[in-house]
Amino acid sequence: MTHQTHAYHMVDPSPWPLTGALSALLMTSGLTMWFHYHSVVLLFLGLMTNTLTMFQWWRDVVREGTFQGHHTPVVQEGLRYGMILFITSEVLFFTGFFWAFYHSSLAPTPELGSYWPPVGVYPLNPLEVPLLNTSVLLASGVTITWAHHSLMEGNRKNMLQALLITILLGVYFTLLQMFEYYEASFTISDGIYGSTFFVTTGFHGLHVIIGSTFLLTCFIRQLKFHFTSNHHFGFEAAAWYWHFVDVVWLFLYLSIYWWGS
């Protein structure tokens, strides 16, 4: 048995970064094949590889943080910094999309009829499904905070209830977004408006799905008594991510749905 005289976690060799990179290659190649040749085989393989990688990598990290006790206060501090940097990178990621939208909408080119929205594009009514989506995400922000406070107070039942409501609201948001896409009178091919609308809202929708998966993992972990009132960074990181998704949607709603229409 080996001993260490420091509080840091020396991570064991892992195959998951390699399989994660492979899944990213398969998914991007699969999307290209799907768009141009209507073949979903590569995309399906990529999604399957990504799901398996995600499940097994999460399993290893959970095992290290619970049963093996590797997540000391020093390690948790490092994880916090890592999550903050990750969310910062996501902020910059969405900044690029908002930049593209405002660049195109504040000074529309003659090709667009010098008009925004472009001639022939009929934007969605911001007071219908988009407003409902906004209320759903704001409600989920309240319930995730309720879950966090319940966890810190040691109230397991309320924490599970609030977390389950948050997950259901996330799923409901995704279904509403799918319905909205189906009903839209324009597509991603309809010029700069369609491109910026679907890419920005689509990536946000992807982040909602990722966040819902993150919260579902936390829900299962809480069922197995993995979290305590003072040792629950996995849940805290998921809550930070969810609040980030909320804030991005508010900017997205005000910019693209309300002002942009």
Swiss-Prot record:
It is a multi-pass membrane protein. Its EC number is 7.1.1.9. InterPro entries: Cyt_c/ubiquinol_Oxase_su3, Cyt_c_oxase_su3_dom, Cyt_c_oxidase-like_su3, Cyt_c_oxidase_su3-like_sf, Cyt_c_oxidase_su3_a-hlx. GO terms for biological process: mitochondrial electron transport, cytochrome c to oxygen; respiratory chain complex IV assembly. The chain crosses the membrane at residues 16-34, 41-66, 73-105, 129-152, 156-183, 191-223, 233-256. Its main location: mitochondrion. It is found in: Mitochondrion inner membrane. Residues 1-15, 67-72, 153-155, 224-232 are mitochondrial matrix. PROSITE patterns: COX3. One of its GO terms (cellular component) is respiratory chain complex IV. Residues 35-40, 106-128, 184-190, 257-261 are mitochondrial intermembrane. Keywords: Extinct organism protein, Membrane, Mitochondrion, Mitochondrion inner membrane, Translocase, Transmembrane, Transmembrane helix. It catalyses: 4 Fe(II)-[cytochrome c] + O2 + 8 H(+)(in) = 4 Fe(III)-[cytochrome c] + 2 H2O + 4 H(+)(out). The keyword tRNA processing does not apply. Component of the cytochrome c oxidase, the last enzyme in the mitochondrial electron transport chain which drives oxidative phosphorylation. The respiratory chain contains 3 multisubunit complexes succinate dehydrogenase (complex II, CII), ubiquinol-cytochrome c oxidoreductase (cytochrome b-c1 complex, complex III, CIII) and cytochrome c oxidase (complex IV, CIV), that cooperate to transfer electrons derived from NADH and succinate to molecular oxygen, creating an electrochemical gradient over the inner membrane that drives transmembrane transport and the ATP synthase. Belongs to the cytochrome c oxidase subunit 3 family. Component of the cytochrome c oxidase (complex IV, CIV), a multisubunit enzyme composed of 14 subunits. The complex is composed of a catalytic core of 3 subunits MT-CO1, MT-CO2 and MT-CO3, encoded in the mitochondrial DNA, and 11 supernumerary subunits COX4I, COX5A, COX5B, COX6A, COX6B, COX6C, COX7A, COX7B, COX7C, COX8 and NDUFA4, which are encoded in the nuclear genome. This is Cytochrome c oxidase subunit 3. The gene is MT-CO3.
